[in-house]
């Protein structure tokens, strides 16, 4: 059988919650606010399908550069290229100082 070339290929572990994290996510995570210039970690939450970014960028750290609707624009470095990822607040974690 030919292999899949879809955007969710090779994401069996990236899009799977651990046993203790199953069920609905904490609602506080979905209404979190971030300021411009703040460092955030990109972490996909599989139980929230809306506002997911491409799984290729899972685990990256970037800087919030603005808002787009309810989501945030995050700039990340991909090699020598700066890319902008749009992600809902449920998929972002604030970097600890």
UniProtKB/Swiss-Prot annotation:
GO terms for cellular component: ribonucleoprotein complex; ribosome. One of its GO terms (molecular function) is structural constituent of ribosome. It comes from the Archaea. Residues 1-12 have a biased composition (Polar residues). Residues 1-35 are annotated as: Disordered. The keyword Amino-acid biosynthesis does not apply. InterPro entries: Ribosomal_eL21, Ribosomal_eL21_arc, Ribosomal_eL21_CS, Ribosomal_eL21_sf, Translation_prot_SH3-like_sf. Pfam families: Ribosomal_L21e. The keyword Secreted does not apply. Keywords: Ribonucleoprotein, Ribosomal protein. One of its GO terms (biological process) is translation. HAMAP family: Ribosomal_eL21 (MF_00369). Belongs to the eukaryotic ribosomal protein eL21 family. This is Large ribosomal subunit protein eL21. It comes from Natronomonas pharaonis (strain ATCC 35678 / DSM 2160 / CIP 103997 / JCM 8858 / NBRC 14720 / NCIMB 2260 / Gabara).
